[in-house]
Amino acid sequence: MATPHINAQAGDFAETVLMPGDPLRAKFIAENFLEDVKQVCDVRNMFGYTGTYKGKKVSVMGHGMGIPSCCIYVHELIAEYGVKNVIRVGSCGAVHDDVKLMDVVIGMGASTDSKVNRIRFNNHDFAAIADFGLLETAVGQARELNVPVKVGNVFSADLFYSPEADLFDKMEKLGILGVDMEAAGIYGVAADLGAKALTILTVSDHIKRGEKLSSEDRQKSFNDMMTVALETAIKL
């Protein structure tokens, strides 16, 4: 039952799929966090894997960069493979003064300059939000693990190299915590298809302060994010 972009078979994916942007990060997660791992897809080198975490079946698959790419994979996973829960695990650039490098940010909502959700909603504004059950579970698991998290609005940008430098000041004023490129699209697809979605991000750089994580610190904060995501996945 392969799709144009996923060559997995029926039953290959768990009901919950963790999705980083980078397919090599998906491979890393599978090899370092899961047991009994099987690679289930590799079209366009967008790798997907299924294994177990603490005895529960969990899948991980890359979604690429940007809303158009992630929407393809999330749509096909939900519509064709019966996936119920999508948890994006990625990085973001902080814009808010209260957010610092290595913080874990959970996207309660996702603003965007993309038009995809307006197209989806007859040119009306759509409030792209996380599923509350996933959000509540993730926050609870973070507290149990003593992983500090910031919960709030993020901004999903179409342009990585944005010409609108003054927009970051407006984002901070409106309480936006950080910038990614996918959350709003994932929330839109999940809502449209009746699935649940959540975005958990690691702050890899601070856009306004020009700060960036070292490779060592990036890995440490990534591990915290992944543990929160996986502990959330097995509670669903």
Swiss-Prot record:
The active site is at 205 (proton donor). It comes from Aliivibrio fischeri (strain ATCC 700601 / ES114) (Vibrio fischeri). Homohexamer; trimer of homodimers. It catalyses: a purine D-ribonucleoside + phosphate = a purine nucleobase + alpha-D-ribose 1-phosphate; a purine 2'-deoxy-D-ribonucleoside + phosphate = a purine nucleobase + 2-deoxy-alpha-D-ribose 1-phosphate. Catalyzes the reversible phosphorolytic breakdown of the N-glycosidic bond in the beta-(deoxy)ribonucleoside molecules, with the formation of the corresponding free purine bases and pentose-1-phosphate. Keywords: Glycosyltransferase, Transferase. The gene is deoD2. One of its GO terms (molecular function) is purine-nucleoside phosphorylase activity. GO terms for biological process: purine nucleoside catabolic process. InterPro entries: DeoD-type, Nucleoside_phosphorylase_d, Nucleoside_phosphorylase_sf. This is Purine nucleoside phosphorylase DeoD-type 2. Belongs to the PNP/UDP phosphorylase family. SUPFAM superfamilies: Purine and uridine phosphorylases (SSF53167). The record marks 218 as: Important for catalytic activity.
